[in-house]
Amino acid sequence: MKLLVTGASGLLGRAVMQECTRAGHEVIGLAFSRVSGALVKLDLTDAKAIHGLIQRERPDVVINLAAERRPDVVERDPVAVKKLNVDAPAILAQACAALDPPAYLL
């Protein structure tokens, strides 16, 4: 199965990628601020980039682990946090639904 993991540079994202790879899945990791190694840099607030990547890679499953969880950042920039925590998952859902067959979004 082909999996796409957002937030792949985080603690949970790295662990999920490792376990999915160990289970024999093809895994594509996405990150934005701490991109290294085989991770793909993607701005999840860029709808066009999200749709393009999902159309190009055609994953079976997208595992969304990207989020801003620090309260001080939420208070300092609630608009940016909403884009990542609310708007980006909606865009991911639309992009997954546009595939034929559609990808599952977790």
Placement of each model-derived feature along the sequence:
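Conserved Rossmann-fold NAD(P)-dependent oxidoreductase catalytic core, especially the SDR/UDP-sugar
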Residues: 87-106
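Conserved glycine-rich Rossmann-like NAD(P)H-binding loop of the short-chain dehydrogenase/reductase
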Residues: 11, 25-35
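N-terminal Rossmann NAD(P)H-binding glycine-rich loop of SDR-like oxidoreductase domains
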Residues: 1-23
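Conserved beta-strand positions in the Rossmann-like core of class I SAM-dependent methyltransferases
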Residues: 4, 28, 82, 106
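Rossmann-fold cofactor-recognition segment
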Residues: 32-48
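NAD(P)H-binding glycine-rich loop region in Rossmannoid oxidoreductase-like domains
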Residues: 44-84
